[in-house]
């Protein structure tokens, strides 16, 4: 089964008031866990490679081939998007598209809005020629993302409206108080701004840094137009905690399969739980029919 784009996937989710989870891949076994979770839950899924981890994972072509081969070997039948997360430049997005990624995020959020729009339009124009969906970001999601530390800067409503109108993107990540990594204290999303941005742009919104956000805030974000929710930290913590427990119980373990398997199983269970929480479980059949 070929990769699908986010365009119709997220439009359907927004219309039906649920969200599709993006789960970042951190290796082959990690990818298997995400795909297996999606198949068991009959949920569409977005498997993402962060730009900063692409080289670590073997490059764009390796990632595309690995995910595609796993889908075939595992007989995956649910819709799978292969997405570039936080693409750092138009060139990196082009490389991902040429390697077979079905979706890319161009992150120009650290630049002035005019430059952000120009970068995004360049990517969107190239992606449109290849049938690939595009996500952009306005404002700054704080915290740590693969070693990059930044502060929170709320998205401006007018800037969000501009980037959507001028670039023809498929999804918008509007920074509204979420952070990458672990939260210090209670997350506090900007729902007033969220409602205004959703109304003005009328496209699927993306919630970055969703690990650790309380379920009631997640549900409210979905009702206010979020159709894609990104999870990475919770999966990493689940894997690390379980792997650490394995070594605490048996410090003599040395076979990777022996000490990694419980952690991978924890990742799968975390992904399944999030799919149920986001309301995407059981939606694969409708997505395929639609």
UniProtKB/Swiss-Prot annotation:
Necessary cofactors: Zn(2+)
Positions bearing Phosphothreonine: 233
A matching Pfam family: F_bP_aldolase
Taxonomy, superkingdom: Bacteria
GO biological process: fructose 1,6-bisphosphate metabolic process; glycolytic process
EC number: 4.1.2.29
Gene Ontology molecular-function annotations: 5-dehydro-2-deoxyphosphogluconate aldolase activity; fructose-bisphosphate aldolase activity; zinc ion binding
Residues annotated as binding Zn(2+): 86, 180, 208
Keywords for the protein's UniProt record, in alphabetical order: Lyase, Metal-binding, Phosphoprotein, Zinc
Transport is among the record's keywords: no
PROSITE patterns (alphabetical): ALDOLASE_CLASS_II_1, ALDOLASE_CLASS_II_2
Biochemical pathway: Polyol metabolism; myo-inositol degradation into acetyl-CoA; acetyl-CoA from myo-inositol: step 6/7
Catalytic activity field: 6-phospho-5-dehydro-2-deoxy-D-gluconate = 3-oxopropanoate + dihydroxyacetone phosphate
Record-annotated active site: 85
Binding site for dihydroxyacetone phosphate: 181, 209-211, 230-233
Sequence similarity: Belongs to the class II fructose-bisphosphate aldolase family. IolJ subfamily.
Biological function: Produces dihydroxyacetone phosphate (DHAP or glycerone phosphate) and malonic semialdehyde (MSA or 3-oxopropanoate) from 6-phospho-5-dehydro-2-deoxy-D-gluconate (DKGP).
NCBIfam families, per database record: cbbA, fruc_bis_ald
Protein name: 6-phospho-5-dehydro-2-deoxy-D-gluconate aldolase
Naturally occurring in which organism (per UniProt): Bacillus velezensis (strain DSM 23117 / BGSC 10A6 / LMG 26770 / FZB42)
Organism classification: Bacteria, Bacillati, Bacillota, Bacilli, Bacillales
Gene name of the record: iolJ
